[in-house]
Design a protein with these regions (language model features):
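Intrinsic-disorder/low-complexity, polar/charged segments enriched in Ser/Thr/Lys/Arg/Asp/Glu/Gln
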Residues: 102-104, 177-179, 215
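Fungal secretory targeting signals
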Residues: 1-24, 238-244
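Exoplasmic/lumenal beta-rich domain surfaces
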Residues: 128-183
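Internal, hydrophobic beta-strand segments that form the core of beta-sheet-rich folds
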Residues: 181-212, 217, 221
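Extracellular Ig-like/FN3 beta-sandwich strand-entry sites
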Residues: 100-102, 115, 198-200
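Short edge beta-strand/loop segments characteristic of extracellular beta-sandwich folds
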Residues: 104-110
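N-terminal "mature-chain" segments and other terminal, solvent-exposed stretches
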Residues: 17-99, 113, 121, 125-130
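Short beta-strand elements
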Residues: 213-244
């Protein structure tokens, strides 16, 4: 009976269970945002991986200097137009970064394979062309080794048996937040336009776990470019973004 139960678990359990995501990023000159495709409080912290991982971005390559915005299980391929969704969650003002300033925020480790260390690369065109981007210096790092972190002590007999048999990978729910911070080089300018918002850069933050990699993409602006006429002032009524 136990063997049959374990076989049933093999059928219904995902084989790759690992995730970490960018919950919020703030600029040193103000403003904040979430990563593209983040769904907010409707996604629980603890629980089954199939429920807790739906808005975690997975990238195709472990090399941080690779193009693309990644994808989530909840919404499929990430798109720049999802910035409207991020603004609806976080407010009208994107992270504003001063010259030689920083971005900081929260990296949420969902499961044990979604940990640090993480890296960040900035795309000044706001299109996801990260292969041509600029690496950011890490100021505050997310804990972990090769994208892994120690699992919680409490694990069910059911899960221990599945792990021992090699049926599922060793990725238990962690549900913990960790601070992260990156330095943006002096002289950085943003040329992207997303949903009518000008002067936008995209920043990819991700670990290098081969099961993923996992992380997220956030939009930022350089405060000196925005000035007194804030290009992030938009309306999100009816789920649409308009210039204010």
């Amino acid at each position: 009976m136990l063997f049959k139960a374990l076989l049933f678990s093999l059928i219904v359990s995902p084989l790759v269970t690992a995730h970490g995501k960018v919950s919020v990023i703030t600029g040193d000159a103000g403003g904040n945002t979430t990563a593209l495709a983040i769904q907010g409080g409707i996604v629980p912290g603890p629980g089954k991986n199939s429920v807790t991982e739906v808005d975690t971005t997975v990238f195709r390559k472990t090399n941080i200097l690779s193009d693309g915005l990644g994808r989530t299980t909840g919404q499929g391929a990430n798109k720049v137009k999802m910035l409207a969704q991020a603004i609806a969650l976080s407010g009208d003002t994107l992270p504003q970064v001063s010259d030689n300033g920083t971005i900081s925020g929260v990296f949420h480790i969902v499961t044990t394979d979604g940990a640090g260390p993480v890296k960040a690369v900035l795309d000044p065109t706001g299109t996801g062309a990260f292969s041509q981007g600029t690496m950011l210096r890490t100021v505050t790092q997310v804990p972990g080794k090769h994208g892994n972190i120690a699992a919680p002590q409490q694990r069910s007999l059911h899960m221990r048996a599945l792990v021992a048999m090699g049926i599922v990978k060793r990725a238990a729910n962690v549900n913990e937040d960790f601070p992260v911070e990156f330095s943006v080089p002096a002289g950085t300018t943003c040329s992207g336009t997303i949903n009518g918002i000008n002067n936008v850069c995209l920043v990819k933050i991700a670990n290098s776990n081969k099961a993923g990699p996992f992380g997220g993409v956030v939009a930022i602006q350089m405060a000196s470019q925005v000035g007194s006429n804030n290009d992030t002032a938009v309306s999100t009524k009816c789920g649409r973004a308009f210039i204010a």
